[in-house]
A protein has these predicted regions:
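Non-transmembrane alpha-helical segments in soluble domains
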Residues: 21-24, 44, 48-52, 112-119, ...
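Generic recognition of short, well-ordered alpha-helical interface segments
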Residues: 15, 19, 42, 46, ...
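Short, helix-capping/interhelical loops that line the mouth of catalytic, cofactor-
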Residues: 2-7, 57-108
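Extreme N-terminal tail/first-helix region
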Residues: 1-23
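Short alpha-helical hairpin
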Residues: 17-22, 87, 123-130
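A charged, amphipathic interaction segment
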Residues: 96-151
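Short, contiguous alpha-helical
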Residues: 30-78, 82, 129-159
C-alpha cells in the first residue's frame, strides 16, 4: 500500500473511532434528518448493524449487487465520491425498524463497541476478507473506506 493511501486509511479510521462520536454527541436527539425517515437513534442502530456484518457478528453470505455492476460499485468505494442523499439500501424495508436500544446514549455506546470489535478483528487477523452484500469481499482497507463513506453520509444527514 502506498504511503498516501495508508495515511488516508489511518485518518479515516481515526474518524470512525473518535471524530464521528465527538460530532454525533453534539447533535440533539430530536433533530430531524435532512433526508430520509430514520431518526438519530435509528441511524446509529443502522450503523451498528452494518458494522456487525464486518466484525463477524452478523455475516452476510450473499452478494446482492448483480455481477455485471459489482466492479462499478467497487470503483465507487475506492473513489472520492460520497453516497448521495436518499441512497436506497435494498436490505432495509420502506420504514425504519423499531428501536433496539432503550436510549440514544446506549445506541451510541453499542456502536462504539461494535467499531472497536471490528478494528480488533482486523488487527488480529491481517489479510482477513469479509463479505459485504453490496461491495463483495472486502479487506480491512475496503471496510474502512466503506464505513468512512457510510458514517460521513449519515453524519451529514443530521448536521
Amino acid at each position: 500500500m502506498n504511503l498516501n493511501l495508508m495515511r488516508m486509511t489511518n485518518a479515516q479510521k481515526d474518524f470512525l473511532l473518535n471524530s464521528f462520536f465527538e460530532q454525533i454527541m453534539l447533535i440533539p436527539s430530536d433533530k430531524a434528518p435532512a433526508w430520509g425517515k430514520m431518526g438519530l437513534q435509528q441511524m446509529i442502530e443502522h450503523l451498528s448493524d452494518s458494522v456487525r456484518m464486518a466484525n463477524g457478528k452478523q455475516p452476510h453470505a450473499e452478494i446482492v449487487t448483480p455481477a455485471e455492476r459489482l466492479q462499478a460499485v467497487r470503483d465507487f468505494l475506492y473513489s472520492e465520491r460520497e453516497f448521495k442523499p436518499e441512497t436506497k439500501n435494498s436490505l432495509m424495508g420502506p420504514e425504519p425498524p423499531p428501536l433496539f436500544n432503550e436510549s440514544l446514549d446506549l445506541a451510541i455506546a453499542e456502536l462504539q463497541h461494535e467499531v472497536k470489535v471490528w478494528v480488533e478483528l482486523f488487527e488480529s487477523n491481517p489479510g482477513l476478507i469479509v463479505r459485504n452484500p453490496f461491495f463483495g469481499d472486502l479487506d480491512e482497507d475496503g471496510w474502512t473506506r466503506l464505513f468512512y463513506k457510510h458514517f460521513l453520509h449519515h453524519l451529514k444527514q443530521f448536521s
